[in-house]
Every structure is written in C-alpha cells, then in structure tokens.
Swiss-Prot record:
Residues 19-90 form the IGFBP N-terminal domain. It comes from Xenopus laevis. PANTHER family: CCN FAMILY MEMBER 3 (PTHR11348:SF8), CONNECTIVE TISSUE GROWTH FACTOR-RELATED (PTHR11348). This is CCN family member 3. Immediate-early protein playing a role in various cellular processes including proliferation, adhesion, migration, differentiation and survival. Acts by binding to integrins or membrane receptors such as NOTCH1. One of its GO terms (biological process) is signal transduction. Residues 190-235 form the TSP type-1 domain. Disulfide bonds join C21-C46, C25-C48, C28-C49, C35-C52, C60-C74, C66-C87, C249-C286, C266-C300, C277-C316, C280-C318, C285-C322. Keywords: Cell junction, Cytoplasm, Disulfide bond, Gap junction, Glycoprotein, Growth factor, Secreted, Signal.
Amino acid sequence: MTPHLALCFILLIQQVASQKCPSQCDQCPEEPPSCAPSVLLILDGCGCCPVCARQEGESCSHLNPCQEDKGLYCEFNADPRMETGTCMALEGNSCVFDGVVYRNRESFQPSCKYHCTCLNGHIGCVPRCNLDLLLPGPDCPFPRRVKVPGECCEKWVCDSKEEMAIGGFAMAAYRPEATLGIDASDTSFACIAQTTEWSACSKTCGMGVSSRVTNRNARCEMQKQIRLCMVRSCEEEPGWHVEKKGKKCVRVRKTTKPIHFHYKNCTSVQPYKPKFCGQCSDGRCCTPHSTKTMHVEFVCPQKRIVKKPVMVISTCVCHYNCPQDSSLLQVENARFPGLKTNL
C-alpha cells in the first residue's frame, strides 16, 4: 500500500470512529494502562481514554489505534465492517549503505561504534560509544582519544602541554558545542556524520578564527568550517564587572554595555553583550570550556550584508596549559590541507 492510499485509509478510519464515539468521555478506567518499553501511551480514537498504542502485527480498531509515529496504520482489508484490523507499516523508500539495501525503518550496525536506521531513503545514525557524553573535566584541557586493544570504543587520556607540542593536536579546553539554528538530529545525510571539535581561537584577544572538519553536507565530503571567535577584548572595555578582592582568577567576564563585533571592514548589524574569558594573576590562563555558534549579520562597505558564524562563550576554565597564539590553528591547517572552508 502506498503512503497516499494509507493516508486515505487513516482519514476514513477517523471518520468511522467519530460515528461510534460517545458524546461524553466518562467511562475511562481510573488508572491508565501500563505499556511495554518503547510503546507510547496515547488516547483512543475518540480522544477520550489513554490506551497503549498497538504495534506492527497486532490487532487494532478505532478504540485501539496503532502507533503512528512508527509509521503504522490500521489495515481493515479483512473486515468489510472496518471494526477490527491489523497494524501495518507504511511503505517507504529503501536505503543503500556500503552496497547493502535496507528496508524502510530497518536498523543495522555498520560498525561497532554506530547504530543506524533507514528512514524513507535516508540513513540516521547514533553513536554507541559515550566519548561525547563522558568528557574529561576542566583539569584536562588537552584530551586525546586512544584505541584500547580488544575494545571497540576509544577512551580519553590527558596529555600535557609539552606532549601535545611534540606531535599531537589539542583543542585547548574546548568541548563539543551546540550550533544555534541547526538541527543536530537531521537524518538527511546518507552517511555516518563525523565532526571534529572546534579548534582553539587563533587569537588570545581580539577577533580571531577557529575551525573544525565535518562531513555533514549533501555530498558527505570532509570540509573545513571556520567561525569567528573572540576569547576576550585586547583593550579594557568600560563596564567590566570588577573581580572580588582576594580572587586570583576571574573565569568569565561580561560587559554591561552592548558592543558590536568587527570583522575586517565589517561591523555587526546588532549589538551584543557577549561573555569573555577573564584573566589570572597567578600565571594561569583562561580559555573557553563550553561554546555555541550563532550566525551574525555584518554590514560591510557599500552596505553589503553578510552572515558569519561567530563563537558564543558559555563557560571558561583557568589552567596552566596555556595555548600559544595561533599555534593550534596552524597545526590543524597542516593536518587537513586543501579542504574547502566556509568563511
């Protein structure tokens, strides 16, 4: 059955159900039923009483509907009176991954690290390893993933600043961040999404850039993304919050007056009140710990309007593993030469 024809059946079922529904919802049990895991508790076809959604292959009716969010509908072909049917799955487009064809809503594991599902011609995958959920703490500004013999998932280890300078790559206390305006659960990509963390800002003060590499695009090709970033202002701006006496570090500072971002010869259209990382008096440096990305409109010469991704600081961390200005960005450029950028 095609999705269009199935939709017509669903509308017809709802019309029949409306003819058999009571005028008042006063016969529901006092306690709602207990449903099996992954089975939703929904209202019956009359919109009165809570019932457990029927699953694929189970009997169904207007009072016991199927779980529609799983692509199920009640098939009444065997009952001309349309009173009792069977939950069936809507047909959808199949998926092809690594030469293997998967049916709509079929789940599979392309590797031990990912669990994927075919959703009407598109493949959506979720990681099975919890590296991004159990991140190192603020005392580990230079985390590195290592393979463990005999195990599928990698583990975090903390390197010192000296070890990273020899031949490694550090993110300088950066952590995975949320991108404002972008749906991270988008399943329109027919490949396993891979995205590195954002690099440290190329400037310790003033406007700089940070970058990451991702394949989240229509062609699933690895591309470098660049965003503007400002860890702190190079000049002491009026309106800073004054730190308390006796404190050696101020992790986060915020202006009381809105400011405009400046990029080359362009200025942000709207003023903002961003958070900046503070300073320490005991030799430690403060770098972003949790960030987001938002798109900011800039007005350029000839009144040209452009949008640029800009880092938004949520929290900062103070530590002794201080990154050198621009060094981490130069290391990343050496690791991914020739990649297209978005800035």
